[in-house]
Amino acid sequence: MIYLIILIIIAIIVIIFFLATGLYIFKSTVTRELHDIEKSYTRYVENNLFDEALYNSASKEDITLKSFDGLNLTSTLIMNENPTNKFIVLVHGVSICYVGSLKYFDIFYKNGFNVLIVNQRRHGKSEGKYSTYGFYEKYDVNMWIEYLKSRFGNDIILGLHGESMGAGTVMETIPLNDSIKFVIEDCGY
């Protein structure tokens, strides 16, 4: 009888340990604290991580689309000053929002691309309660691709660039859309 009681106590301790560990992992990944947009932007400017003058002078359009599960998702479309059918979709990592993609803006813009910088769900001005590390985000990126095709035509040259969680997301998007011509996966997870 004493062994049964000890076994039950050990089982309860193990269950509590696994529940606590699961809660910790959930809070530190799926609902982790997001970076402040203004502070991140200021840090990127101070560290010369992108050409702010070029970014500010470029023609920008804020776009909001409704995701398959009803969230308002935001992006900024930057049309190149030289007309082109080349588009790149920049997808940031977890917790940083669109600011994390600005360091790649110059490279693509100066090489003749129109640039769509997205705010993944739960980031920036996009709605959402959780980051799903590509599980739902891949459908969001596919939605942005379809938006670009519907607006600019099926003959656009379309690439994806993702960093960290964004890299995982763009890799998961590949099987969803045959229009993707290239993908840059930068440090997936």
Where on the chain are the PLM-derived regions?
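Conserved alpha/beta-hydrolase
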Residues: 105-127
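Primarily recognizes the serine-hydrolase "nucleophile elbow" in alpha/beta-hydrolase
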Residues: 147-151, 155-189
